[in-house]
Every structure is written in structure tokens, then in C-alpha cells.
Amino acid sequence: MESAEAQQEGPKHGMHPSFLNTIRQKERVKERLKGIRQKIGVYSAKGGVGKTTVAVNLAYTLARMGYSVGLLDADIDCPNVPMFLGTDAKMDISHFPLKPLDVRGVKVASTAMVVDDAKKPIIWRGALVAKMLGDFFENTDWGELDYLIIDLPPGTSDSPLSIMQLLDLKGFVLVTTPQRIAAVNSIRSGLMAKRLGVAVLGVVENMSAGEPTASTKDVAAATGTEIIGTIMMDKRLGEMADSGRVPALEDDKAYNEFKRIAERIK
């Protein structure tokens, strides 16, 4: 329910109360995150293209390069970052603001770290998910960081929209795969970001066979950016991720692939 103050001030400022509340929340989020130098989203409208793989390895690559890094799992419905890191540790929710967990040198926060059973589905309507995201941003204390890498949910509806509206992002890394259907959805993602005034920093082709495909080149062209990296299809790296090991920490080839991406978005 809108506060009496918001209801009174809405007409005075010529704004709907809900819009006024969004502006106020954005100001509170900005204040909370003021110690973070760069906030970068990893995004695609298509699920299953490897957003979390890219987000996790990019975060740990930046940490390995000597930067202070946070990793935010912003996928409320399917928060997979803790599984990729092989941790079931929980954040302390008895005190606010919440403190991210240090997982191998990177500060990590995820809704999977605040619910009793992360394996149970979260069945919420879009508006409630958007509110949860706003509350999560507003009530998590990251401290001072060089980079916050944000693993976005797929789609172009409430969740990614809320993130684009509430966070002052440097921009997005778009993730796609060689398949045409992934490219079509990645283009949707990039155009949505640009329409909302958020930069597209570059395109990454995951599960690549080597040279970027024509479909991936189409994504870069349609969004006015460049292909900044290709991640090779490698069964061994997939097995590492399944066992909670971060390839960028343990495999020099993987690290160098992600380092090339990191150098392009710094």
C-alpha cells in the first residue's frame, strides 16, 4: 500500500505515487551501492546460453587480476550461482543490512543464500519478484568494490526491467550461442537495454566452435557493439562447473579467455 506521504506528494510533483516511490528507492539503492566503482550486468533474454557461466568466471577472473569484486545472483526464480560455486552457505538474515559471503575471494549474494531450501521453487508474480530485487539491492552492504558483476535473469519483463531502472550500470555483456534462436533473443536483450539507456559493452559467444558465427555477428551489428570474446565448447570445463569448481581459477586457458573479455569491459 502506498504511504500517505507518497499519496500526498504524488499530485504535487505531477507524478503517480508508485513512480515517485521507484525514484526514491533508486536513490536509496544508489546510496547503498556508492562504494562500487563499476556495476556490470551479464544478460540474455534466452535462458540456457551460459549467462551464469560467464558471470561467475568473469567475476573470478577480475579477482584474479587483482580487483575487489562482488557477484550478485539477481535471478530470483532460478538462483544458480551458489551451485556453480559449490557452496550451500547462508547469509545471516538476522541483521540488516545483509552482508555478502566471501567465497574464494569474491563477495557473493544470492536469494538462494537467504531461503531455507534453495531447491524449492519460488512461485511469485512479477511485481513481487521486482519488489524482492529492489529490497535485495537496498539492503545488501557490499562495501568498497572495484566491480560488481550481476547475473541477470533471462527475459525482457519485470526482473531485468527493475534491474535496469534501479541500478546505475556501466552496461551489459550480452551472452549468446552459435544458434540462430539464441541470437534473435540476444538482439531483443540488447535493444531493450539500449531503449532504457543502458550501454551494451559487447557480445560473448558461449559454447563456441572457434570463430564467431554469422548469428553472433548479427547480434553485435544489431546492438551497435562488438564481439568481445568466445568461450570454447569444452566438456572438461562443464564438468568442473558441475562440481562447483571455477574454471577461471583452475584452468589457465579458461582464465585467458575470460581475461580477454575482462580487458574489453574494464
Model region roles, listed by residue range:
Residues 38-75, 190, 203:
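Walker A/P-loop phosphate-binding motif and the immediately C-terminal alpha-helix
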Residues 115-166:
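Phosphate-binding/switch loop-helix module in NTP-utilizing enzymes
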Residues 1-27, 190-266:
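C-terminal lobe/tail of nucleotide-utilizing enzymes
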Residues 36, 47, 73, 81, ...:
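Residue-level signature of catalytic and energy-coupling elements of molecular machines
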